[in-house]
């Protein structure tokens, strides 16, 4: 750190929405934090739209460095950090939840203009900056050691950030080894990774459900023999027959990751769950899901919303990756230099399936 007192970082002015590559002092870690040299940072498919203010999220009151997830090496640890060490390679995750004993602790996604829960504005004021920089200061509680993954390229390890979100949904519904699970939206960014995660968790069959037959086939091929592509036609009877045939009957559990304008595919998957089946909702479809009380009651269905994942989830995925159960090698990085962030944001919406957009430092 003595030789790196300055760094390059992208700064966003929340008033003008102007994004500029700047020289900034390299951050020094406060108590409970670490400074990480960033090797790779993830660019979300909607990042350009997000930073332009088109999604209606609440921005910080002052300029900040955007960027959510990353891979890097710890350079310095602050006081009160007991386990993280300089030189340790880590995965950086953004889901910060206030560590206090209350019913609804404040939470936010670091480097992402959105806040959730009372007190989140204060939380964001303390932890403003994200990963689109050569160095970041990050809470030690949100970096996960990845030494067990050896010399795997940072852009490949960044697949952990793609996988951990659907993992949170599958944990929410208690996916068990040997079960049959449907991933709705499996041709999308998170849904495709959900197929790999469900396989790693021991599902006997994973139905990769969606509209894009070509991408679904690619995702299923990457997953192996237990992954079955199910391209939907929009014909409820035909889609039901395809799901039932592939599952060998009813489905035990499902994860919904769709962002389409219609919830029709969600309803189709739901109605192919067995009695007592579970559905995790993690998508962003704006259309309500129409389901009657009687139908819910008669089938003992559980429908659960899930935002993000438990704090121990990234560590679980590192171990699943190190053992070979989670196939990070199936992730397809699209790489850009830090200075090329605008180009990366322009092209990120074109991602399909197991692709990921990454800045390489």
Can you describe what each PLM-predicted range is?
Residues 1-7, 168, 238, 267-268, ...:
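C-terminal hydrophobic helical "lid"/dimerization subdomain
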Residues 27-42, 55-108, 149:
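Glycine-rich beta-strand-centered segment in the early N-terminal region that forms part
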Residues 91, 254-255:
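N-terminal Rossmann-like NAD(P) cofactor-binding module of classical short-chain dehydrogenase/reductase
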Residues 96-182:
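NAD(P)H dinucleotide-binding glycine-rich loop of Rossmann-like/cofactor-binding domains
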Residues 142, 147-234:
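Mid-domain Rossmann-like dinucleotide-binding core that forms the NAD(H)/NADP(H) cofactor-binding site
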Residues 171-176, 246-247, 271:
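Glycine-rich helix-loop-beta junction characteristic of Rossmann-like nucleotide cofactor-binding loops
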Residues 203, 218-221, 259-325, 360-361:
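Glycine-rich phosphate-binding loop and adjacent beta-alpha segment
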Residues 236-248:
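Short amphipathic alpha-helix with an adjacent loop that forms part of the alpha/beta core around
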């Amino acid at each position: 750190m003595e030789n790196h007192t300055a760094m390059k970082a992208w700064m966003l002015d929340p008033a003008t929405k102007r994004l500029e590559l700047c020289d900034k002092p390299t951050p020094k870690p406060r108590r409970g934090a670490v400074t990480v040299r960033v090797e790779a940072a993830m660019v979300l498919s909607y990042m350009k739209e997000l930073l332009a203010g088109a999604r209606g999220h609440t921005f910080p009151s002052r300029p900040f460095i955007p960027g959510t997830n990353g891979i890097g090496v710890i350079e310095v640890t602050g006081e009160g950090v007991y386990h993280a060490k300089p030189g340790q390679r880590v995965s950086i995750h953004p889901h910060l939840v206030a560590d206090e004993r209350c019913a609804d602790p404040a939470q936010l996604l670091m480097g992402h203009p959105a806040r959730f829960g009372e007190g989140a504005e204060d939380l964001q004021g303390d932890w403003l900056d994200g990963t689109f920089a050569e160095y970041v200061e990050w809470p030690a509680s949100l970096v996960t050691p990845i030494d067990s993954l050896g010399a795997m390229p940072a852009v490949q390890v960044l697949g952990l950030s793609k996988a951990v979100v659907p993992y949170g949904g599958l944990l929410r519904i208690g996916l068990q080894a040997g079960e049959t699970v449907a991933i709705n939206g499996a041709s999308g960014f998170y849904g495709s990774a959900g197929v790999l995660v469900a396989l790693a968790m021991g599902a006997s069959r994973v139905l990769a459900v969606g509209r894009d037959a070509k991408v679904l086939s690619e995702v299923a091929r990457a997953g192996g023999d237990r992954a079955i592509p199910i391209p939907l036609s929009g014909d409820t009877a035909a889609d039901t027959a395809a799901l039932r045939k592939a599952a060998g009957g009813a489905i035990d559990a499902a994860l919904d990751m769709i962002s389409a304008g219609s919830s029709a595919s969600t309803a189709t998957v739901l109605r192919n769950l067995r009695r007592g089946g579970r559905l995790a909702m993690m998508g962003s479809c704006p259309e309500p899901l129409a389901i009657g009380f009687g139908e819910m009651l008669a089938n003992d269905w559980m429908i659960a919303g899930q935002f993000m994942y438990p704090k121990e989830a990234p560590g679980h995925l590192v171990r699943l990756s190190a053992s070979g159960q989670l196939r990070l090698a199936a992730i397809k990085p699209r790489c850009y230099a830090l200075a090329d962030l605008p180009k990366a944001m322009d092209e990120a919406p074109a991602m399909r399936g197991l692709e990921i957009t990454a800045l390489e430092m």
